[in-house]
C-alpha cells in the first residue's frame, strides 16, 4: 500500500510535465530545449544529493564496470521516453499526451516475460522468468479504457497529422520508460539506491541531451527566459521529485510482478492531474459526463490494482467441534 501511495504522489508531479510542455509549445518554445534542459538542470541537484549521502563514488565504480550497459538502457529509459513526449507536445494538447501515455500501464505488464526474479529453490536461489500477471493485465486494461473515455470528448478535433506526430511518439515512450527502468532495476536494484540510479541514468544519457541542445541552438536559437524557467520547474518537479518517488516505489516491490504492475498503474493519476491542471492553468475544456465516467473508471481500476496486489491471508483450518 505504501508503494502505491508513493506512486500516486509521483503521478501528481509527473503531470507537471504534460501541462508545462504544452504551455511552452503554445508560447513558441522548441521541444528540443524542453527535453534537453530538463535533464541538464537535473544533474547538479542529483549530484549534490548523492554526494551529501556519500554514495557518489560507489555509483561511479558501478558505471565504470558496465559503461555501455548504462548508456544503452539510459538511452532507452530516459531519451526514448522524454524526447518523444516533448516532441508530441508540439503537435497535440496535454490531455492527449497524458491520455495516450497510459498505454505504459499495459506496456509494463506485457514486458514482464523479458525479466527474471530470484526465487529460493531446493538447489539454491535461481532466476525464474517472470510471467504476465493476468489479474494485473485485466485491471490495467480497465484503467486504459477509462483514459480512452476521457479522450473521446476531444476526438472530433483530432487530425491525421496530430495522431501521427503526437500519439505514435508517446506509444514509443510508453514502452521505453518501463523497459529502461526495469532493466536498471533488475541489474542494480539491490546495489544502488534510487538517487544513485536516477543520477547514473541522467549522467549516462547526458551526451544525447547535449546533442539535442546543440541542435536546438543551431535550428531555433537560445531558449527564451520563460521556457528556461518552465524547464527548470519540470526538472525539479518531474525530473527529480516524481522520478525519484516512482523509482523508489518500484524498488520497494521489484521482486513481485503483480505489485510492480500495481505501482506502474498509479501513473494513470497523471491523466487526472493533467486534465485538472489544463482546466485551471491553460483554460482547457471542462470535462464532459463521459470524461467524468472515465475518471471514475481510472480511480476504480487503481483501487482494484491495490486490492489485487495485497497479500492473501491464509485461511485457518476449521477446527472440529466433535468430541470423542
UniProtKB/Swiss-Prot annotation:
Report keywords, A-Z.
Cell membrane, Membrane, Transmembrane, Transmembrane helix
List all membrane-crossing ranges.
Answer: 5-24, 39-61, 68-90, 95-117, 130-152, 162-179, 199-218, 228-250
Q: How does it sit in the membrane?
A: Multi-pass membrane protein
**Major location (coarse):** membrane
GO CC terms, sorted: plasma membrane
**What superkingdom heads the lineage?**
Bacteria
Q: Where in the cell is it found?
A: Cell membrane
Q: Which InterPro entries match?
A: EmrE
Question: Does this entry carry the keyword Plastid?
Answer: no
Q: What is this protein called?
A: Uncharacterized protein YjlA
The major lineage groups are:
Bacteria, Bacillati, Bacillota, Bacilli, Bacillales
Amino acid at each position: 500500500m505504501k508503494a502505491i501511495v508513493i506512486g500516486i504522489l509521483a503521478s501528481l508531479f509527473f503531470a507537471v510535465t504534460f501541462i508545462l510542455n504544452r504551455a511552452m509549445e503554445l508560447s513558441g518554445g522548441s521541444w528540443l530545449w524542453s527535453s534537453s534542459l530538463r535533464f541538464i538542470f537535473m544533474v547538479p541537484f542529483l549530484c549534490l544529493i548523492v554526494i551529501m549521502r556519500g554514495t557518489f563514488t560507489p555509483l561511479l565504480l558501478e558505471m565504470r564496470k558496465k559503461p555501455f550497459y548504462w548508456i544503452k538502457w539510459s538511452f532507452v529509459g530516459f531519451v526514448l521516453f522524454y524526447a518523444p513526449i516533448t516532441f508530441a507536445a508540439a503537435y497535440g494538447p496535454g490531455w492527449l499526451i497524458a491520455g495516450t501515455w497510459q498505454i505504459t500501464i499495459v506496456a509494463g505488464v506485457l514486458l514482464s516475460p523479458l525479466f527474471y526474479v530470484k526465487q529460493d529453490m531446493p538447489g539454491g536461489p535461481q532466476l525464474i522468468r517472470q510471467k504476465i500477471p493476468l489479474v494485473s493485465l485485466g485491471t490495467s486494461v480497465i484503467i486504459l479504457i477509462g483514459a480512452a473515455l476521457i479522450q473521446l470528448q476531444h476526438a472530433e478535433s483530432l487530425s491525421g497529422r496530430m495522431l501521427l506526430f503526437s500519439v505514435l511518439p508517446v506509444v514509443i515512450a510508453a514502452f521505453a520508460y518501463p523497459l529502461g527502468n526495469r532493466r536498471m532495476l533488475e541489474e542494480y536494484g539491490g546495489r544502488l539506491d534510487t538517487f544513485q540510479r536516477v543520477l547514473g541514468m541522467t549522467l549516462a544519457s547526458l551526451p544525447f541531451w547535449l546533442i539535442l541542445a546543440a541542435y536546438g541552438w543551431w535550428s531555433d536559437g537560445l531558449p527564451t527566459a520563460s521556457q528556461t524557467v518552465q524547464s527548470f520547474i519540470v526538472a525539479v518537479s518531474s525530473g527529480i521529485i516524481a522520478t525519484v518517488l516512482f523509482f523508489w516505489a518500484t524498488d520497494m516491490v521489484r521482486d513481485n510482478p503483480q505489485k510492480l504492475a500495481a505501482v506502474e498503474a498509479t501513473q494513470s493519476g497523471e491523466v487526472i492531474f493533467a486534465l485538472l491542471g489544463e482546466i485551471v492553468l491553460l483554460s482547457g475544456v471542462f470535462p464532459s459526463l463521459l470524461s467524468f465516467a472515465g475518471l471514475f473508471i481510472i480511480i476504480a481500476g487503481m483501487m482494484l490494482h491495490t486490492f489485487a496486489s495485497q497479500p492473501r491471508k491464509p485461511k485457518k483450518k476449521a477446527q472440529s467441534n466433535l468430541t470423542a
